[in-house]
Amino acid sequence: MCIRDSYKEDIALFAEMGFKTFRMSIAWSRIFPKGDEEEPNEEGLKFYEDVFKECKKYGIEPLVTITHFDCPMHLIKTYGGWKNRKMIDFYKRLVTVLFTRYKNLVKYWITFNEINMILHLPFMGAGLHFEENEDQTQAKYVSAHHELVASAWATKIAHEINPDNMIGCMMAAGNYYPYSCMPEDVWAALGKDRENMMFIDVQARGYYPNYALKFFEREGIHFDISDEDREILKNHTVDFISFSYYSSRCITTQEGVGETIGNAFKGTKNPYLKSSEWGWQIDPLGLRITMNTLYDRYQKPLFIVENGLGANDVLLEEEVDGYRVSDDYRISYLKEHIKAFKAAVEEDGVDLLGFTPWGCIDLVSASTGEMAKRYGFIYVDRHNDGSGTMQRYKKKSFYWYKDVIASNGEKL
């Protein structure tokens, strides 16, 4: 049983936990199978309409990511993915259909999932395939510009169709710490933060910052920024800033220092932090730091749309203390991160729209392609080799998070 067949049962489980919001994404190829068709696929549109209505039945607000590491293969093979400016028009057609069809069902939208990941996972982030001897850095930033312009167009179109729509950008967040107080390490950390912030600078402020323009000039990166691009970026900035946060990062200019593993963001191992099974360093205070950094910089509402712990959960043959899956490690991780964002809101004055953990149910991990790297409150009997019944089991964290929601975070 896949999510297509079981979404009603799964949404009922989310409602049992008390979900107020459910973050999901729309597969571009379900709406336009090739990506460049003139007319959408009604069957795909109807499927998502049914999903949204099922959410609404339980009082759950959909939070919809339009593009979540997916690009129709036809667009990659025929046009080169987001390297091609024609992608902007294909995307405009897609979002116009979505905003029109779901005008009364969806209010909160995210244009691109973790848009800065184009620099680290270019095929996932923008459908990029590089030819031999191709300037990959040039291709990444050309593609990024096309996505940024497309995002601004989506914001414009969304507000024209329904002024109540709330459109957000999204980044894979987590501040870089300098490994030492050496000025070179501090400078390196600033450079890495800017590398990621540039995407939000453009979407939240409406223009490329000077440091980015100087970087393009220095690196010989050239792409066409038309007057229309400048106008659309300037006048159609996002309503909120969403982000994923799993861990902070660390960097040094020194040699011989240990590196982190298991993450698309390569960095220096922080000796003050513990690590997950996959080498991601656990830093709840880093979430508070990241939130303050983003809010101070942009003064726009924030939305934490991914935060969680990937772990190798074990499904027991029989219940122990009432649970088939006892994931106290996940409860501990989420508890400390909830404390951190509560402090950011209550003590620091950060404007936070909401929090959606990653993920509510087990699914294949994007970073490793494994089912074994589980994040959900609900265990899905599916394994790396494809075996399993797909049966759902409530983990210990399911019941814990239900109490967290019911108490609005007071009972942790």
Q: Model-found features: residue ranges?
A:
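N-terminal, well-ordered alpha-helical segments
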Residues: 5, 12-15, 46-53
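Aromatic-lined carbohydrate-binding/catalytic grooves of carbohydrate-active enzymes
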Residues: 17-44, 64-67, 78
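Active-site region of glycoside hydrolase catalytic domains
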Residues: 35-36, 46-412
